[in-house]
Amino acid sequence: MAESSGNPPAERIGYITRVQSFSACHRLHSLRLSDEENKEVYGKCNNPYGHGHNYKVEVTVRGKIDPVTGMVMNLTDLKKCIEEVIMIPLDHKNLDKDVPYFADVVSTTENLAVYIWDNMAKALPASLPYEIRIHETDKNIVVYRGE
């Protein structure tokens, strides 16, 4: 193990991930496609009555580890941000009817990740957002990094 010289190390970058679960329903349906095309593209997820998910979202921030606090950011602040950006607008909601963003955007998990990213980016210092990872099911996971 390397010995410490007592000098602070060069800037270190850390990653913090907070996990949050929420439930919501939606229907995969594009206004740019005919009813027949929607059924073909989205299958059972185009059911007119919609369907629901218990989403698990991982929000990861990246930044310099503050030499004084030892933190990239205060987890309490990240928790509040997630509450405002994810839980209040999305939990137990119909994404297509209750979230204005999805009025003309198909509520795929990819677009949900973009929505969460864009709103987290507005709520956090610019350098911090790193990744949004959404587990739609145990087998289906979407990752978005603002690219």
Curated annotation (Swiss-Prot):
Catalytic activity of the protein: 7,8-dihydroneopterin 3'-triphosphate = 6-pyruvoyl-5,6,7,8-tetrahydropterin + triphosphate + H(+)
One family name in Pfam for this protein: PTPS
Q: Which UniProt keywords apply?
A: Lyase, Metal-binding, Tetrahydrobiopterin biosynthesis, Zinc
Q: Which GO terms describe its cellular component?
A: mitochondrion
What EC class does the entry list?
A: lyase
> What this chain does, per the record?
Involved in the biosynthesis of tetrahydrobiopterin, an essential cofactor of aromatic amino acid hydroxylases. Catalyzes the transformation of 7,8-dihydroneopterin triphosphate into 6-pyruvoyl tetrahydropterin.
What is this protein's name? 6-pyruvoyl tetrahydrobiopterin synthase
Q: Which organism is it from?
A: Poecilia reticulata (Guppy)
